[in-house]
Every structure is written in structure tokens, then in C-alpha cells.
Amino acid sequence: MVSVAFKQNLKKKYGIKFNNEKLLEDAFTHSSYANEHPGRKDYEKLEFLGDAVLELAVSDYLYRHFPRLNEGELTRMRSNIVRTEGFSEFAIECGFPEEINLGKGEEKAGARKRKTLLEDVFEAFNGALFLDQGMPAVQHFLHLTVYPLIAEGDFNASRDYKTELQERLQVNGPVKIEYQVISEDESKPSFKVQLLVNGEKVSEGQGRNKKAAEQQAAQAALDKNK
């Protein structure tokens, strides 16, 4: 069962109160739990729907907010957003892992922390929200969770700063480039890395995942050498 505290947080933080709470329950029910509890439905069909809903919602947002990007750049950015790592982090941020109904075997196997499962639940939740309240409610939820990070450039696929930096530094021969994690907070999540060139610190970067932090560090290094 989805906890009362979670439902209260949904209302307080995101303004979401399900009219049909069974949809919410189904969105957090893994097939392993449904197999152990006859009569319970798992989230697989909601996940199927949510995948399509999220792709449409994100595509619409990118089309409206990034008019200068071409089709290829928009596609790459969308791919970065909807990848497993991205949605699993949003699921963690929203407190989804604790609410998932798992079978005993999956619970023992640590499935609650599995990124692919968290991505599935995030998609299922949005599928359930779409059925319960329509696309405007989904867009509202994404405006509070996903879209702010798109606006900040966390998923920018139009430039690859790491590759640009590597090409610039190695123009005269091999150079050792390292990205080291300084700190991480998986509860948020947030990563901070430092960039070393031939063992010397050049810059730092921070992001909601290691890849984003490394890109920011590379961008900072490029900005220093403009």
C-alpha cells in the first residue's frame, strides 16, 4: 500500500491528489508482488502508457523552448532526458523507492534500488497520472521535477564539452585527462567532480549525475582557455 505520508507529500509538494487511488497503487506494484497477491495488478501496462506520455510531453517541451535546435539536436536531448539513469534519479528525488510493492525474492535481491525498476515506476506513475487527470497534470508534475533541470542545461546534447576539451588538449600530443568524484549525495542526487590534466587540478563541476558533473567541469576548463 502507498503510505499516507507519501500521498500527503504528493499533495503538498506537487499539488497531486489522485481521484482514483487504485491507479496510484497499481503504479507502485511490481509483477513479483502481484504474483504473490492474487487480485493485485502490476504496473506494466501503466509503464507502457507512461513511456509514451513522457516522450510526448518532453518532445512538446523541447519543441517549444528550444526553437533554435534542429531535429537531430532535439532528438539527442530527448534521449538524454528519457534514459534510464535520468528517470531513476527523478524517482529517487520524489521518494518513489520506499513505496514500491515488491515480492519477497525481489526485495531480497535489492530491486528497490535497481535503476531500471525505478525508471519503470516513474513511467508508470506518469501513466497513472495521465489516466486520472490528463496531460495537463503530467505537464504540471514535470514542470516541478524534470523541466527545471532541462532549462539549466543538465541534458544539453548540442555540445559535448568533454570531447571538445580532449581534442583541444591533445592537439600537440597525448595528455592525461582524469575526472575524479569529490563528493556525492545519492539522496538528492548530486555529484561534484574535479578535472585533472596531467595530475594537476584544472576545474570542478557539479551535476545531478556524474556525467553532467563531468560535462560542467570540462565546460569550465574550456571557458578558462577561451
Curated annotation (Swiss-Prot):
Main location: cytoplasm
RNase III domain span: 7-134
Record's catalysed reaction(s): Endonucleolytic cleavage to 5'-phosphomonoester
Sequence segments annotated as region (Disordered): 201-226
Catalytic residues of the enzyme: D51, E123
Pfam families: dsrm, Ribonucleas_3_3
Cofactor: Mg(2+)
Entries under CDD domains matching the protein: DSRM_RNAse_III_family, RIBOc
InterPro entries: dsRBD_dom, RNase_III, RNase_III_dom, RNase_III_sf
Span of domain DRBM: 160-226
GO terms of molecular function: double-stranded RNA binding; metal ion binding; ribonuclease III activity; rRNA binding
Record keyword Nuclease present: yes
Keywords recorded for this protein, A-Z: Cytoplasm, Endonuclease, Hydrolase, Magnesium, Metal-binding, mRNA processing, Nuclease, RNA-binding, rRNA processing, rRNA-binding, tRNA processing
Binding site for Mg(2+): E47, D120, E123
Biased composition (Low complexity): 214-226
GO BP terms, alphabetized: mRNA processing; regulation of gene expression; rRNA processing; tRNA processing
TM segment ranges: none
Subcellular location: Cytoplasm
EC number(s) given by UniProt: 3.1.26.3
Annotated GO CC locations: cytoplasm
UniProt xrefs under PANTHER family: RIBONUCLEASE 3 (PTHR11207:SF0), RIBONUCLEASE III (PTHR11207)
Job of this protein: Digests double-stranded RNA. Involved in the processing of primary rRNA transcript to yield the immediate precursors to the large and small rRNAs (23S and 16S). Processes some mRNAs, and tRNAs when they are encoded in the rRNA operon. Processes pre-crRNA and tracrRNA of type II CRISPR loci if present in the organism.
Subunit record text: Homodimer.
Entry protein name: Ribonuclease 3
Lineage: Bacteria, Bacillati, Bacillota, Bacilli, Lactobacillales
